[in-house]
Amino acid sequence: MKLFNICLVIFTTLLSPTLLSAEINSGDTAWILTATALVLFMTLPGLALFYGGLVRNQNILSVLMQCFAICCIVSVIWVIYGYSLAFTGAGSIIGGTDALFLSSLMRESASGTLPESLFVVFQMTFAVITPALVVGAFAERMKFSAMCIFTVLWVTLVYLPACHMVWGGGYLGSIGVIDFAGGLVVHATCGIGALVAAMMLGPRKGFPGGSLVPHNRPMAVSYTHLTLPTKRIV
């Protein structure tokens, strides 16, 4: 229902007569709409299936709920202050507060050749999938409540500054750093975060020597087939 409401807002905005201007490119808009859906699809059900298939049977629901919870938590963060800190303001490390609660978002707002509302949701999908990728590093070893706290802190202290510095007009962007597909903002940040989390938590109970066989390999492999079209966006 939440995803449906977001999509409804986007399409209502796109159909507004005020957007029928030279600034908005219909081809760019259609493609970014498609890319937005595909990136979200990589997280739910993509990553949920992948990590769920690799853990033991007794932990599958825990991993699935972590992926779903991250999607919900980051979506709320993005609307309240995430987009504002990532894409507004002239700070070199972090953005400003001009768009808290998306207060600056108008029906006629544009970001390049796209409606700004679409740009907000597109960038939100990357903010969602990045901490979700870290789940694999602490699977079966972190409580749900701890994961929620970790997600809020990690997105706020790591992802948002990195996003602003590269994509939001911050320091790295000003010195010529280019990241078209998220190699730095997404993959580098979540990779380092996953490494630190794994080192802090240590190995799973029973490793080595215990039975840690994935409970459903076909379920994990299905993620690869489901997301092959998605990889085309990069």
Task: Kindly give the residue locations of the regions a language model identified.
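Hydrophobic alpha-helical transmembrane bundles of multi-pass membrane proteins
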Residues: 3-12, 16-226
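Generic cytosolic/nucleocytoplasmic N-terminal low-complexity/intrinsically disordered segments
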Residues: 1-4, 230-232
